Structures are given as C-alpha cells and as structure tokens.
C-alpha cells in the first residue's frame, strides 16, 4: 500500500473516484505534481494505492535530460511542486504555517547546499559538489514555492 503514485501506470476504480468527486487538477497539468496531488487526495478520501511489481512501464528519456542543468532544474521544480501540493491539500488556515516552514527549510537547504558545493569543489570531490548543487536547487524551489513562485512549465502538452 502506498500514499502516492505516478500516473504513468495507474489503474483507478472510477466508481470510487466519481463517488468522492476527485479530478486531476489542471493547474498542475503543465507544471508537474498533478498525479501526486490526485493520488494524495485519493488516499485522503479512503482510496488505496497498491504496488504491482509485475507492471511494466516504458518511459523514453531524451538525452537532453541526462545533462546536469536539466537535472538541477528538475530538482528545483520537484521541490517547488512538493510545497505546492502541501498547500493545495491544506486548509486556508494551515497555509501560513506551511509557507513559513517551507521558507525556513528552503533557506537552510540553500545555505547547506551552497557550502557543500563549495567544499566539494575546493577539495576536488565531484560527489560532494553534485550533492550540494542538488540540495541548493531543491532549496531554491522550496523557498520560491513558499512565496507563491517556483512554477516551472515542466510539461507543455
């Protein structure tokens, strides 16, 4: 049983989905996170997501997505999306606390990620530099989303 799932290989009980009034949120359609929000709402409404190890998915990954700049943009985008999903799931009264927690967490990640990137570069350790760059990118996404930004059109259908 899982709390969230990607939608590239998702079978749904449409009767349940319709009974509880769930729909994919189009505001997340081109930015990513639509499947995360939907499946989190599905579980919150009492739905169950099960993993099927035998399911096969073929997902073509263009060579351009194997480059460091794309991967860092993706990390920033995913981090921002996680905050946007939390805000969408929360009631209006909970949003200020979520935004404050996200802003603080984003700032910490930016500082630690920047330091780790610098240290990794100075000592010639690409692993530490890469992990620092990833943490820095995620921090930027979290901080941006905490203030209402961070939206990146991941998928232009």
Spans of model-derived segments:
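Non-catalytic, C-terminal membrane-associated alpha-helical segments of glycosyltransferases
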Residues: 73-80, 91-157
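Nucleotide-sugar-dependent glycosyltransferase catalytic core
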Residues: 27-31, 39, 58-81, 87
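Substrate-positioning beta->alpha
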Residues: 13-16, 34-38
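A recurrent flexible, glycine/aromatic-enriched loop bordering the glycosyltransferase active site
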Residues: 1-12, 29-33
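Short, well-ordered alpha-helical scaffold segment located
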Residues: 15-20, 56
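Catalytic donor-sugar/metal-binding loop of nucleotide-sugar-dependent glycosyltransferases
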Residues: 26-28, 36-58
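A residue-level structural signature of the nucleotidyltransferase/glycosyltransferase Rossmann-like core
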Residues: 2, 9, 21, 48-50
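Activation segment
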Residues: 20-21, 61
């Amino acid at each position: 049983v899982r709390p969230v799932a990607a939608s590239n290989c998702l079978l749904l009980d449409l009767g349940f989905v319709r009974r509880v009034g769930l729909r994919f949120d189009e505001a997340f359609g081109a930015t990513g996170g639509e499947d995360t929000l939907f499946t989190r709402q599905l579980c919150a409404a009492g739905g169950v997501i099960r993993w099927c190890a035998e399911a096969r998915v073929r997902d073509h990954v263009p060579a351009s997505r194997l480059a460091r700049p794309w991967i860092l943009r993706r990390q920033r985008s995913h981090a921002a999306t996680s905050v946007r999903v939390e805000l969408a799931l929360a009631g209006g009264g909970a949003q200020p606390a979520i935004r404050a927690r996200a802003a603080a967490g984003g700032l910490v990640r930016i500082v630690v990620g920047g330091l780790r990137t610098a240290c990794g570069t100075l000592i010639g350790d690409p692993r530490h530099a890469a992990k620092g760059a990833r943490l820095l990118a995620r921090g930027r996404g979290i901080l941006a989303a905490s203030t209402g930004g961070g939206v990146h059109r991941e998928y232009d259908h």
